[in-house]
From Swiss-Prot:
MF (Gene Ontology): translation initiation factor activity
Listed name of the protein: Density-regulated protein homolog
Family, per entry: Belongs to the DENR family.
Biased composition (Polar residues): 45-56
Ranges of compositional bias, category Basic and acidic residues: 81-119
Gene: denr
Residue span of region Disordered: 35-124
Amino acid sequence: MSDTESSTPSQPIVVVEYCKICSLPTEYCEYGPSAKQCLKENGPHPNNNKNTASGKDSSNTTATTTTTDTTTTTTTSTENTEEKLKDLKIVDDSKEVSHVDAGKSESKEATGEEKEKEKVSKKKKEVKPQIIIEVNQRNKRKHVTKITGLELYGIKLSDAAKVMAKKFSCGCSVVKSISNPNSEDIDIQGDFGEELVDLIEEKYPTVPLSEIYFLEDKKKVKAR
């Protein structure tokens, strides 16, 4: 034996175990395609456990550091928020009327007024003009028949007075109304209440008989 051979130290033989499932060395099974099946078959490799433990320790240390930093940041931001809230004043707007609410209330009031106007206009439209016939006694034997409201149906009073004077052969004239100075009545000399209703029905068919009334003791009574 030479001096060179005697001076070289002998190295231990390394035995490599191969996995029966993935055909990789068992210490690399965890990186293979079937790591779970390899772990069941071979169990954990000693080298991998050490690496895993060290990895876990380092990850735990990093997580702890990160958590501490996060907690510190959160605490600082919370303190800043509390300081800002102290400077704020709480304002109660529940009792104040906003522009939108005011606009709504105004629109509701306007709508209510319009509805009232519509109701009044409808009532006015529904009210039909009435013709009132009143027979008054003058002296003991004389009577005067007064008719009011013919002009409301577009009848010219002067023409109607001529028709009545001719029909009843009596005096007939257009006079100012006592109850309403702005309107006029027709006065007929005599008692012609019922005959006057027949004349209106014959000569003026546009006038509904249901709107002709007799005025008796200051009360209106339908003529027909």
